[in-house]
Structures are given as C-alpha cells and as structure tokens.
Amino acid sequence: LRAFFFSPHTWCIMAPSNDAAKDGQMNATTTCGIPRLKNIEQVSEGWINKYILTYELPDGTDYVYESTSRKKLEAYRAGLMANARGEAPRVDAVCIVGETREGTLLMIREFRYPLNSWCVAFPAGLKEPNESIRECVDRELREETGYRLRSDVDEPVRLLPQAGFSSTGLTDEAIQIVFAQVEKAGDAQPEENELIAPFQLPLSDVRRFLDENTTLIGTRAQLILEVFAARAER
C-alpha cells in the first residue's frame, strides 16, 4: 500500500514500514522528491499542439505523459518552467460572470465543436497578447453577447486573485474568472464559425435551472451557478 501527498513543490510517497505491516499498523516511511521534466517533444502542430512530456520520478524511473497546448514549443516550455518556479500563470483566456442591474446573470448557449452539441456556459474567450484583462472582457462581451461593461459603475470588474487551470490533466490553459457588471450595448458580433445564443438567467431561478437543464453544461458554469443558488437559499 502506497499513498501520495503533495505540497506546491514536493512529491511524496508514503509506504508502511516492514514492522508496521507485520503489526497491521499504519506507521509509515516517507520518501519525498520532485518529478524532473527531462524532455518535451512536440508530436503535432496546429491550432492545438500535442506534446510528449518525459519526467524522471523521485524513484529514478521515467514517466511519459501526453499533453496539449495552444502554445508553440518554446512558449510552452517557458510556461512549464515558470510553473515549476511557482510563478503566477500567464492568463490565456477569460470567463465572464456578468450580472445585470435587473438581477440576472448573462449566460450563453454555444455550439461546441469538440462536443458536437450546444453547451451552456458563461461568456468567455482568448486574451490577445497585448490586451489588458478589462479590455479582453469588454471585447468578448460585445462580440459574443452584445453587452458591455456598465458605464455608470466606477469599477465594473472584479477578478479572482489568480488565474485557474481549465483541465489540468490535458492542457496548460489558464483562465481568469472575472465578475462583471454588464449592460446591453447593441447586437452581438460573433465570428462566422461561432454559434452563440445569449440569454439572461434570473438569480432567483438558478436552482431551478440547474435542476431542470438538459443541455450540456461546462463545469465552471455548474460550479459558479451552484454558488449563486446556495447564496439565494440562505
């Protein structure tokens, strides 16, 4: 029996000692170390790039792992090294939790090609290289929904303290969740291949929506909506 536990920079294996195993006790010996990234091989290139990562585990054995990223090889390598140093991740995209003055959440149904289906989500999009978070939020709102940041609020955006990773078993994509006060600005202007239907969800209806929705839904949307539902039920 072996157990694994982690700190930000340490990887540990905990195994029962021989004497403990004889006695049926859980006294254990612990070996700690850090997996070492030995090699990154790019095996396909495109909008999504695929990589083979070779690690040396603390016990000296090699471990090969497949991953994907929108970043090209050198940018991907630099990002992995920055992660290992404990640096804050560079924001790749934003997820916008927009609330209107009418007490509704701004949501979308978007056709997601990897799913071959419509999916419920919050408005979101990739950040341009020289774009601020606020600029990205306002642009994505206008493009996907026809909404904008409210002009009558001094600070219409609130960022979570750090960007979070969208799917840590697959990719390095880091997403900044932004809570925003939004208002209608005009017509949406999505790209030709973007099929997006914005809708407003009253805060009082969030629990019923979660219980009754049958359209596919993103995990972020599920979790955030659950928080709003629980808050409304207090």
Which residue ranges define each predicted feature?
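Nudix hydrolase/Nudix homology domain
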Residues: 15, 19-21, 27-34, 39, ...
